[in-house]
């Protein structure tokens, strides 16, 4: 249950990404700068945090031992996750982007047997079934808006988000396997940020070539995203997944808490960007998303009690 609560908190901070990225897009900012600046700001922040703990050297040592896996899965887990997600804000509001990104819930469940073939782990069916409830809510939440959007805009929003939704759990889990508990959460995020820098420098060059330098307001908002979503939310989410990394049902449950981003992003846009309040269909979708999150939490508790009957007796 602790991992689930931490996951929900991370969803709250992650929602800042969708709200402010949409805000920057509406103000005419470049999606490439919004994406690359976030990670450029994250690097010194993480160096300060990990440096204060005197844990930077183990990270660099681990990277030097096997730089290729670090570079590959950091680029996948951070670069191919966040760049497409930011690009999608051109074609849809933040809450719609957040809703579509919930495909990551199913992606995380279906990746289970592919990522650990030696242990022959099965797809957690219970988690997949509950995830379909969440996705049904996601569909209803975006239905009203999607009906008024041109097909080209829908495709340019959805396809990048499919890539993003698969890349995030894939990169995260492959790095957990590679690190194998040798580094803590902050160290792992620092290492991934360092090794994804070539990707962000290339993207910033593209941003400069197409839009010039970013405006001061975009730099400020990107810094806020870096702190709230890039550092706080990412650390909370990775910490939650680390707590349950060897238990598939619970890991799928933690990843499912990210569906809360839809709710937080929707109400954040209403309050901060004066977005229209959703209709009945969208509200029904939000309720399904919440129901799915609750069911995942209950399933996590049930699974824990089944494995440890003494916990039930103690209560």
Residue ranges of model-derived segments:
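Juxtamembrane helix-entry segments on the extracytoplasmic side of multipass membrane proteins
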Residues: 1-3, 28-32, 36, 62-66, ...
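Hydrophobic alpha-helical transmembrane segments of multi-pass integral membrane proteins
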Residues: 2-6, 32-52, 129-136, 159, ...
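Hydrophobic/aromatic residues within transmembrane alpha-helices
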Residues: 24, 34, 38, 87-89, ...
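Helix-helix packing/entry segments at the starts of transmembrane helices
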Residues: 11, 37, 97-104, 179-196, ...
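C-terminal-most transmembrane helix of multi-pass membrane proteins
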Residues: 39, 118, 251-315
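Glycine-/small-residue-enriched transmembrane alpha-helix faces in small-molecule transporters
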Residues: 1-37, 129-132, 136, 147-177, ...
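Hydrophobic transmembrane alpha-helices of multi-pass small-molecule transport proteins
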Residues: 46, 123-145, 279-300
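Specific transmembrane alpha-helical segments of multi-pass solute transporters/efflux pumps
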Residues: 13, 54-98, 140, 228-246
